[in-house]
Amino acid sequence: MSNIRRLPFTFLMACSLVAQAAAPQGWFMAGNKPADYETGVDAQAGLNGRPSASLKSKKPAIEGFGTLMQEFKAEQYLGKRVRFSGFVKSEGVQNWAGLWMRVDKGKKTVAFDNMQSRPIKGTTGWQNYEVVLDVPQDATGIFFGILLDGIGSVWLNSANFEIVPTSIPTTGGEPPLPNGPKNLDFSEIR
């Protein structure tokens, strides 16, 4: 293989390693533009002076997203309802940010929520957020994290993953279909 052909692969690997070097232990960077974001741990930036993870854009404009995430086997959560939660603060988020979680069966996603319907935008103080999903009996993997679409900065503190009772509603999935047609005369305006 020529040096020119190796260059793109080597460059991508170097970018990936740089991004991974700053990620907190047990976490990694991903997304469709992970090289456009940086992550790290702010030792005393969290609630009560506790460490928090940060995810920040590195460019003045980004068409895409980055995420700081974890993944693990679903085995011990099969048939359970689970919640990923944490306190998040944001600064200058122009598109949106949010916690997210996905449950897969093989290569197929069977449950998903990324808070896009209730996004974090702009500059906010610490607020508690959560995503809650059911893990089917045949699930194989669980993935979760914090994502930033476009530019800005977000911090995650006091992250928690737990089994919850079914009395706590899920946050993911498609909204239920209405019982019939609506607004056929277009008189209702958002």
Where are these regions (language model features)?
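Extracellular and organelle-lumenal recognition/adhesion modules and their flexible linkers in secreted
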Residues: Q20-R190
